[in-house]
Amino acid sequence: MHTQVLFEHPLNEKMRTWLRIEFLIQQLSINLPIADHAGALHFFRNISDLLDVFERGEVRTELLKELERQQRKLQAWVEVPGVDQDRIEALRQQLKSAGSVLISAPRIGQQLREDRLIALVRQRLSIPGGCCSFDLPTLHIWLHLQQPQRDAQIETWLASLNPLTQALTLVLDLIRNSAPFRKQTSLNGFYQDNGDDADLLRLILTLDSQLYPQISGHKSRFAIRFMPLDSENGLVPERLDFELACC
């Protein structure tokens, strides 16, 4: 059983979008293989949410900019004595490769948007109970296909996201590992500090405290209010130690 809980909070819009995309892509794989109606609806709902996120911004453009920014940051480390040059060069090549694959890929999500089954299910998701067999006979017959046939189709759908997934995973890994966790202490359930142009806050609390953070702010400054899970009887200690990384 976990004794610590990690919370992450974005400090700008691009990071908020990236974390949502990461979450949705992870959700797509949780219930695989799809063998029943519940698993299918979970999968298609996350596909629909993912396409909605894609339509709200220039995901590819922002990721390409970030890949270039991370390459520049790595270049600055080359001159630092004692740095693992091979590791730096390997990361730079990974960033360069991910950028090349992403820029040459079709429009993100285009294959999913054009798929007839996904489009049909997506239209019905906003209707309460709108995915019954009489509403979506296409989905009903799809769920009665042989498992390998469904698996192959899902694999094709997910493969269309690989250029995005590869670039996003690399970028988020570098950002998350860009700053160490440091011990901090809140007073009367409140903590604030400068953001120093950070993109992401990462915070670790012990599970036995049964507290969660409410975080607000941006890249320059942020504030954290610690709240009890039990809003009626829970208590927040006068001094609370936690770990924080500004990435």
UniProtKB/Swiss-Prot annotation:
Subcellular location, record wording: Cytoplasm
Keyword Cell division included in the entry's annotation: yes
Predominant place of localization: cytoplasm
Any single GO BP term: division septum assembly
Swiss-Prot/TrEMBL keywords: Cell cycle, Cell division, Cytoplasm, Septation
Disulphide-bonded residues: none
Cellular component, GO annotation: cell division site; cytoplasm
UniProt function note: Cell division factor that enhances FtsZ-ring assembly. Directly interacts with FtsZ and promotes bundling of FtsZ protofilaments, with a reduction in FtsZ GTPase activity.
HAMAP family: ZapD
Subunit architecture: Interacts with FtsZ.
Family that this chain belongs to: Belongs to the ZapD family.
Protein's name according to its UniProt entry: Cell division protein ZapD
Source species: Salmonella arizonae (strain ATCC BAA-731 / CDC346-86 / RSK2980)
